[in-house]
Amino acid sequence: MATTPKTTTLKTIALASKPAAKPKAAKEAEARLQQARRASILLKHVSDPTRLQVILSLAEGERHVGALCEHLSQSQPAVSHHLALLRHGGIISPRRAGKNNFYSLTDIGSELAKVVNGLMA
């Protein structure tokens, strides 16, 4: 019984294992899903009234933690917790000056402040 030689090469295996290219509509749908996921994460960061107050306060200008504690009538650990969540979400950015941490809104934070102000009007 004669055997036929295998003509499979590494190139053929590599080509066969590549996933088929996605159609344009599927790529666009995937991009929209990723945008929705990013928006969902962002909205989770601002889903707390205290964090919204922090954003609105920082929309008026940079503040240090002590000023935010006084403005919010909350303890420093509580305010620091909210600031950490907002910082992690890319909504605020810190600046160290001596022993004080000053916080300000990022571009995303500024846009969120405008939206929140519009909703509260």
Regions found by a protein language model. Name each.
Residues 1-46, 111, 117:
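N-terminal leader segment of winged-helix/HTH proteins
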Residues 20-23, 77-83:
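Short, functional N-terminal and low-complexity linear motifs
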Residues 33, 37-77, 97, 101-108:
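N-terminal helix-turn-helix DNA-binding core of bacterial DNA-binding proteins
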Residues 49, 86, 115:
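Solvent-exposed, charged/polar functional surfaces in cytosolic regulatory/catalytic domains
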Residues 70, 81, 87-88:
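Alpha-helical residues within the helix-turn-helix
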Residues 104, 113-121:
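C-terminal edge and immediately downstream basic/flexible tail or linker adjoining helix-turn-helix-like DNA-binding
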